Amino acid sequence: MKMTLIAILTCAAVLVLHTTAAEELEAESQLMEVGMPDTELEAVDEERLFECSVSCEIEKEGNKDCKKKKCKGGWKCKFNMCVEV
């Protein structure tokens, strides 16, 4: 009786661990698919380039020194463009 109970509990534990590991692997594979461009990040990068250069041009037209707008989130303004730090 004890051996049957131990065997059932062991099988249940292995099944739970296997299912959890399979779900984690599936989630990781979906996040790291190769060949699929991350359009959201590309759009953010383009927006940052645009924001920085436009703000600089507007300040130049106003006969003021170009004070580059600070880029946020690990980016800095360099040569009228936001670049990653």
Swiss-Prot record:
Subcellular location: Secreted
Propeptide section residues: 23-48
GO molecular function per UniProt: toxin activity
Main location: secreted
A GO CC term assigned to this protein in UniProt: host cell postsynaptic membrane
Segment forming the signal sequence: 1-22
Disulfide bonds: C52-C66, C56-C77, C71-C82
Keywords: Disulfide bond, Neurotoxin, Postsynaptic neurotoxin, Secreted, Signal, Toxin
Tissues in which the protein is found: Expressed by the venom gland.
Family from the record: Belongs to the neurotoxin 12 (Hwtx-2) family. 02 (Hwtx-2) subfamily.
Protein task: Postsynaptic neurotoxin.
Protein name listed in UniProt: U4-theraphotoxin-Hhn1u
Native source species: Cyriopagopus hainanus (Chinese bird spider)
Taxonomic lineage: Eukaryota, Metazoa, Ecdysozoa, Arthropoda, Chelicerata
